């Protein structure tokens, strides 16, 4: 009886770490939020490979476009005023933006597992910050959360 219980516990543990238990994270695209105007909420997301991110339109007139992804990861581009879901398949740092409001600082960061492309992501963030009229400090703050 104890052997069957031990096997059951082992099997349950293995199943709990499988991709079948991936999380769907929700990121809102908003005109005005807790961290300012023209933002993604949350602006920094920590996820695992296999998780999905669903970008939810709370205020129309926004889209989501990846600007930097880890090696081997697919880039993405959503349609203006429409929700969008992406599956995060590779570990690393992902930078994304609203194409219409990036100049206003509508950018955000996702870390998936280990930040294997951290130096390249930092360089991409620095280049992106130079093109922003406002909100660059937001991107710096999000990049500072990477561990």
Question: Predicted segment positions?
Answer:
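Extracytoplasmic copper-binding redox domains, predominantly the cupredoxin/blue-copper superfamily
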Residues: 21-147
């Amino acid at each position: 009886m104890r052997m069957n219980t031990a096997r059951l516990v082992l099997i349950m543990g293995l199943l709990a770490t499988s991709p079948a238990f991936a999380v769907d994270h929700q990121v809102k695209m908003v005109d005005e939020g807790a961290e300012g105007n023209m933002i993604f909420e949350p602006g920094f997301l920590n996820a695992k490979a296999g998780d999905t991110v669903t970008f939810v339109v709370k205020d129309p007139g926004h889209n989501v476009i990846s600007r930097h992804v880890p090696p081997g990861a697919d880039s993405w581009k959503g349609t203006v005023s429409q929700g969008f879901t992406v599956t995060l398949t590779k570990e690393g740092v992902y930078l994304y933006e609203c194409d219409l409001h990036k100049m206003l600082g509508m950018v955000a960061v996702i870390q998936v597992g280990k930040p294997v492309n951290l130096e390249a992501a930092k360089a991409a963030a620095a280049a992106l910050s130079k093109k922003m009229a406002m909100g660059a400090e937001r991107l710096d703050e999000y990049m500072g959360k990477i561990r």
